[in-house]
């Protein structure tokens, strides 16, 4: 009897699409799904480009290797299961890729991003590659702690309901001594704000070391709380050169009983952020997250990572607040797209909605929500639009719009608080802030000289530029 010869190892190079393009595949509930905007080089078919993305972000490499025979590639490979042309774009495609759950370490955003947005983004066969959206399976989400506390617990801690929270970034962002910094914090909190904030640039520079800042700020918080009978807070930035120093600062903040700390999650990194989020839950600290560096990653349409993905990743990694743009201020943000990722930050379940850039239905499986923070070039005339756009579960941050008041910091804070309370009352009475917002502010000016002065100062300040991030 003659035995058939085994095919054995077949060395060589073959097209990615022969293995990784599987249009008949139906994604499983346990698959992690990703949507990439792919711009192939001229002459590269979209099927080959999509398959290359699936291969290079999972099990593939440029040539067949002998060790492929030592595992079950069909079990572990990524699969490009659908390709759609991008509307109104030439030679650009949405490629949908499914990744098996076993490719990712439990509870690690770092590992997920290392795989999905790793070396493939430098692939020569592609002119551009952007990760537009991602669907985390419930089985993977349940391995994450998520936000230290979430929106509901934060409101209970603050005893503040039925309105957005009000904040302010202390300016100038660099150069103040710790004592003068604490003075500005006190004036803003006494004037009516709920929070003040370290700028993302503030860490521990020669003009103001972190420990001095923490102590003067905490003194300001305690004094303003005693005078106003309201819970107050300041986002103390614990971002540091090393994780050990970051945790040292966080532990000191917990010792002095400050209510909330802050982290720059993209420059600090997801490993550091997840570590900090777990610490904050254990210690009862709220965690404010700044997105410094995000525009380097997400602003270009054809290459990078969309902010909705970065926001989803932050919700898994952990944070109670996250900056999300303003729509109406000085920073980039188109309304529909912004509200799409705001919903992804704070809702339990979000349906697919292509009009808002949401490519997948996302179930967060009871993971706490993240409060969006609107900050950047906003002032009292923007208040009606901000309340109408973001609703109650948000934090509105006025930096220059508080500290730039002609009468000083405390009157600037009072002007913003009066404008907010007037908008909430008008909304609750059934008035439309979209149509009557300016009238609501003008009426409030009659009984608030602080607001009247702010309105006069900023009556002609607008930031009207076309958003780059559009569908």
UniProtKB/Swiss-Prot annotation:
N6-carboxylysine sites (modified residues): 197
Gene Ontology terms, MF aspect: magnesium ion binding; monooxygenase activity; ribulose-bisphosphate carboxylase activity
Listed name of the protein: Ribulose bisphosphate carboxylase large chain
Signal peptide interval: none
Gene: cbbL
Binding site for Mg(2+): 197, 199-200
Keyword Lyase: yes
Record-linked InterPro entries: RuBisCO (IPR033966), RuBisCo_large_chain_AS (IPR020878), RuBisCO_lsu_C (IPR000685), RuBisCO_lsu_C_sf (IPR036376), RuBisCO_lsu_fd_N (IPR017443), RuBisCO_lsu_N_sf (IPR036422), RuBisCO_lsuI (IPR020888)
Main localization category: other
Organism: Microcystis aeruginosa (strain NIES-843 / IAM M-2473)
């Amino acid at each position: 009897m003659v035995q058939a010869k085994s095919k054995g190892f077949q060395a060589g190079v073959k097209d990615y699409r022969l293995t990784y393009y599987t249009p008949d595949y139906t994604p499983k509930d346990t698959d992690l799904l990703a949507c990439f905007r792919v711009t192939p080089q001229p002459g590269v078919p979209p099927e080959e480009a999509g398959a290359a993305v699936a291969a290079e972000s999972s099990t593939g490499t440029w040539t067949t290797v002998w060790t492929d025979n030592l595992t079950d590639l069909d079990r572990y490979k990524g699969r490009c299961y659908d390709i759609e042309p991008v509307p109104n774009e030439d030679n650009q495609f949405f490629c949908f890729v499914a990744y098996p759950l076993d490719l990712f370490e439990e509870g690690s955003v770092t590992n997920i991003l290392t795989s999905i947005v790793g070396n493939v983004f430098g692939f020569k066969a592609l002119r551009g590659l952007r990760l537009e959206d991602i669907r985390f399976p419930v089985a993977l989400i349940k391995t994450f702690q998520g936000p230290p506390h979430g929106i509901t617990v934060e409101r209970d801690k603050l005893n503040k309901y039925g309105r957005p929270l009000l904040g302010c970034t202390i300016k100038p962002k660099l150069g103040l001594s710790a004592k003068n910094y604490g003075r500005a914090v006190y004036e803003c909190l006494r004037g009516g704000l709920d929070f003040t904030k370290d700028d993302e640039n503030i860490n521990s520079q020669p003009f103001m070391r972190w420990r001095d800042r923490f102590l003067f700020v905490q003194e300001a918080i305690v004094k303003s709380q005693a005078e106003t009978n309201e819970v107050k807070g300041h986002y103390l930035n614990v971002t540091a050169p090393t994780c050990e120093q970051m945790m040292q600062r966080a532990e000191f903040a917990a010792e002095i009983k400050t209510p909330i700390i802050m982290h720059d999650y993209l420059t600090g990194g997801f490993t550091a952020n997840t570590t900090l989020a777990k610490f904050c839950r254990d210690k009862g600290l709220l965690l404010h997250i700044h997105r410094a560096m995000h525009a380097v990653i997400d602003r270009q349409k054809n290459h990078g990572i969309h902010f909705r993905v970065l926001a989803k990743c932050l919700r898994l990694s952990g944070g109670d607040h996250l900056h999300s743009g303003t729509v109406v201020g000085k920073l980039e943000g188109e309304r529909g797209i912004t509200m799409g990722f705001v919903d992804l930050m704070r809702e339990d379940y979000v349906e697919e909605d292509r009009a808002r850039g949401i490519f997948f239905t996302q179930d967060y499986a009871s993971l706490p929500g993240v409060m969006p923070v609107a900050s950047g070039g906003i002032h009292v005339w923007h208040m009606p639009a901000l309340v109408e756009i973001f609703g109650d579960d948000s934090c509105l941050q006025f930096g220059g719009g508080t500290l730039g008041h002609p009468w000083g910091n405390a009157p600037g804070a009072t002007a913003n608080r009066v404008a907010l309370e007037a908008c909430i009352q008008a909304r609750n009475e059934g008035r439309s802030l979209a149509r009557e917002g300016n009238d609501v502010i003008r009426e409030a000016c009659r009984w608030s000289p602080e607001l009247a002065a702010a309105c006069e100062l900023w009556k002609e300040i607008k930031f009207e530029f076309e958003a780059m991030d559009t569908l």
